[in-house]
């Protein structure tokens, strides 16, 4: 059986191909919501199309959140459903299964990790409703232990301030992180921290940005960025502490868009015995996670279990 894990319609698209429980192909295309040529390359990797398409999120559940947020154009848009993707890529003969967004993240990390047991932490802007989750990976299973839901989101908090500072949200958060290195966090720390009522819970939704802050001048930008990075770190610290208390396992798998914050990640080795993440912990590699959830197996290459994912052997 050939299973495709797929992510799409998030400005990028990716496909992972599993045949007979072996990972045969993975490729990520930037800047395209859909790419039929990528599908053709995936077909060539196994000389056949998919029997099953494993979608990285549950789009109908996502639409309930979009309705809650008043995003009615998104709710009515049927062109972003997996069936529409399959038709455009000429693989609409395949069965389609869907998996929760955060569970796809968690599976991409845990099922390619060197650990038989791990604490799995997923933090991003938003999935269907989940924005941060803690999982216990053990005996080939993932059990959700805790979650934070929209509109509370550390990822959206960081993206909102990315926009305030003149960068592109969900794309240029790394520029805020770099700018923070040149700032004084104490100047604006209290004001930035006040957006949280208590750990992981925002006072107001920041999905559409920070609207109660004047446009910062050049002198203030670095100090605001430094404060945002400091508050972000404090919030992730709380999640990491909660994660260990839930699982009592000192092996960490950390994935999701927020796991790309390299400045924070330096702290992880002080908090955990062993730490693992995938080369791209954001949405694209959730294609691998969705495929592995469908096969209910750890990743294998050439019949051997993957103990540390190396993308160069997949594409």
What does each model-found stretch correspond to?
Residues 1-315:
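Short acidic/glycine-rich loops and adjacent helix/strand connectors
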């Amino acid at each position: 059986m050939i299973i495709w894990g797929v992510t799409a319609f998030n400005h990028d698209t990716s496909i992972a191909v599993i045949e007979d429980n072996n990972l045969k192909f993975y490729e990520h295309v930037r800047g395209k919501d859909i790419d039929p040529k990528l599908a053709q390359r995936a077909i060539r990797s196994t000389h056949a199309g998919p029997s099953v398409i494993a979608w990285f999120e549950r789009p109908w559940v996502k639409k309930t959140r979009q309705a809650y947020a008043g995003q009615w154009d998104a709710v009515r848009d049927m062109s972003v459903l997996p069936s529409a993707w399959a038709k455009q890529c000429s693989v609409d003969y395949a069965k389609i299964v869907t998996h929760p967004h955060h569970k796809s993240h968690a599976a991409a990390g845990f099922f390619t990790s060197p650990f038989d047991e791990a604490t799995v932490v997923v933090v991003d802007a938003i999935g269907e409703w989940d924005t941060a989750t803690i999982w216990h990976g053990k005996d080939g299973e993932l059990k959700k232990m805790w979650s934070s839901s929209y509109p509370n989101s550390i990822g959206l908090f960081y993206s909102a301030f990315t926009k305030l500072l003149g960068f592109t949200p969900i794309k240029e958060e790394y520029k805020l992180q770099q700018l923070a290195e040149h700032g004084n966090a104490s100047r604006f720390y209290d004001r930035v921290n006040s957006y949280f009522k208590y750990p992981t819970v925002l006072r107001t939704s920041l999905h559409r940005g920070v609207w109660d802050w004047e446009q910062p001048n050049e002198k203030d930008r670095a100090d605001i960025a430094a404060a945002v990075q400091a508050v972000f770190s404090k919030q992730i610290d709380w999640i990491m502490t909660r994660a260990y208390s839930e699982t009592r396992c000192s092996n960490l798998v950390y994935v999701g868009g927020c796991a790309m914050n390299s400045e924070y990640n330096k702290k992880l080795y002080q908090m955990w015995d062993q730490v693992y993440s995938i080369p791209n912990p954001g949405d694209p590699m959730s294609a691998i996670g969705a495929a592995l959830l469908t096969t209910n197996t750890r990743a294998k290459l050439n019949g051997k279990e993957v103990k540390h994912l190396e993308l160069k052997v997949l594409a």
